[in-house]
Amino acid sequence: MTMTDPIADMLTRLRNASAAKHETVDMPYSKFKANIAEILKREGYIKDFTAKEAKVGQTLEVTLKYGPNGERSIQGIKRISKPGLRRYAKSDSLPMPLGGLGIAIISTSSGLLTQKECLDRGIGGEIVAFVW
């Protein structure tokens, strides 16, 4: 069976693994997912990620990050633009999740960026997800 929204699947796996206090989570690999993982690592939401060879294709292994008392670094993660309803924003109307405490991942012509990077460059794009 084919997956309709592999990005939503990735975000759900991260949300569930974080809630269950798992150390790592595996998912099917794609460049887009690796770019999302790169942003999450750069912003401090995950420890690391690696691409591994599997029986069929590759898998993306994400190492989750927790605080000193076991508190989750990913409190919430939500898919915004979905296959049935795409959401776009101009550079002057980009969202600020939780008043700037979270990040919005934006797909632009320059690749995946956070809303802060989009504001600096003055570009808009498709709002992929919110993370806080």
Swiss-Prot record:
A Pfam family annotated for this UniProt entry: Ribosomal_S8
Keywords, ordered alphabetically: Ribonucleoprotein, Ribosomal protein, RNA-binding, rRNA-binding
UniProt-listed InterPro entries: Ribosomal_uS8, Ribosomal_uS8_sf
Keyword Hydrolase assigned: no
GO biological process, one term: translation
GO CC annotations, alphabetized: ribonucleoprotein complex; ribosome
Signal peptide: none
GO MF annotation terms: rRNA binding; structural constituent of ribosome
UniProt cross-references to Gene3D superfamilies, sorted A to Z: 3.30.1370.30, 3.30.1490.10
Subunit structure as annotated in this protein's UniProt entry: Part of the 30S ribosomal subunit. Contacts proteins S5 and S12.
Similarity remark: Belongs to the universal ribosomal protein uS8 family.
Entry-linked NCBIfam families: PRK00136.1 (NF001109)
PANTHER family, A to Z: 40S RIBOSOMAL PROTEIN S15A
Function, as annotated: One of the primary rRNA binding proteins, it binds directly to 16S rRNA central domain where it helps coordinate assembly of the platform of the 30S subunit.
Name of this chain's protein: Small ribosomal subunit protein uS8
